[in-house]
């Protein structure tokens, strides 16, 4: 017999991802693949040497059985022999199935439905046999180090409703890897903690960076493990691609996939639906924050109901039996839940689960202090500080969502005077927090400074263009604008501030938190249609185009009605403005505009939301004054979103 030559070790190939292989669909082998991206699930690519198929898999063996890391040696049989074995195996399986079905037909005790089911099973078994014959792989010989990814359960795993009898402990490896968890903790302290102020920074550092026990809880406590995994998950989602490669030498998607599965596994073990620990709820809320950042679907909007119910069951806002430390932790957590409830309700759109009273008058916000001012043993009250503190942005968010609820979800706030008064109160409270704040001192100070300016413009815009649909009533009169200010200018200021965060290096750590809000974008688009100031439109249109493209790329999946409405508006305005803008200012300034794709496919437009055959109101209002035209345009946008009596939508929070 001819002697076999030395075998060359195969290079790792990019194979079908785990989910496509389990679903038995063709994978395009991208990272992430198209199937997983369209399904909204995590794609975990598989890179390993190709393994033999069919009958060859039975001859797979290792050079050294004692060494699991030893390279794989493969004996190759002839293709003809492999085909014969596969055909014989397939025929034998089908023969047994047919015999079983025939014997069941002869039984008088088997129903026709059961026979039908077994016939279906026979066909399915035959198909599965063909697939398994061509793709049979020894699972124990896989060379990938990560665990298997199962199809997404939509978030039910963390609630203990996924039907899994034993959590996959392999996913906890990202937490047990101390170097990785320490790196992710540092990312959390830089990117997440300043804007989502839930935890006590010194206690977190002592636990995850110095190895001490967390708040006296025993090691291995389910609540502590779930919190650690949630911190890693939200930190991973806050990374930019550049930061991911610099810190972990891999893609962001791979880090996020590992961290998310570890978080869901540990949360399932801690049972957030039944746990009386505030720590478990902290982990659950951080999971929702991270999930919302990477997943634009309505999953987080649905899961928010659990978070709100659990928080109320724990009597979170009051916490009268706790010491000062416990009260601050409860208030911070409730504030984060209120903010997340407000944000998720806007993106659908729908009514918030938490009422205006529960979020404002019945709740006193946490202290404006630094984390270093108190510790778990502090029992006395600590007064507020002046200047920028660790909780400044968190308190700004509290005032933002409070003003947003009053202006958009409170039926009693209708007249111009009360709306303007709420805006003034909001400006006074937020600008007071900026006293002695130097925006050039730190990235956090810079981000807080510019976001507050964005929020102030949003509050003024919301007072002028409220989101309450009038349903045939009289529109709210337009407030007098300050000199040099217009509705379009306010909307542009918001869009420019968002773009600034995504382009300035100082905003890199906070880009995950800032997306393009749809309301200023819709107002800017409609105002460009009717604005008579050509120079303002020429300045505004490239900003609007860039914001629209960014919105479509990041949050377009959150609400079909919003996406369709914005796309329809853009098609209308592009058709009117592009010829005149190109004649007036051809060249580089309009490169972004001319390169932007224009989609007018009828199948993408829901007839209940917008009719392709019916013109916009703004197209037929030439006889009206500019103010009436502007209001008519906004009414058309709101009407297109609320054809189903839902009521309201986004204000100015992304």
Swiss-Prot record:
The keyword Lipid metabolism does not apply. GO terms for biological process: DNA-templated transcription. One of its GO terms (molecular function) is zinc ion binding. It is found in: Nucleus. It holds the Pfam family Zn_clus. InterPro entries: Sec_Metabolite_Reg, Transcription_factor_dom_fun, Zn2-C6_fun-type_DNA-bd_sf, Zn2Cys6_DnaBD. SUPFAM superfamilies: Zn2/Cys6 DNA-binding domain. This is C6 finger domain transcription factor nscR. It comes from Trichophyton verrucosum (strain HKI 0517).
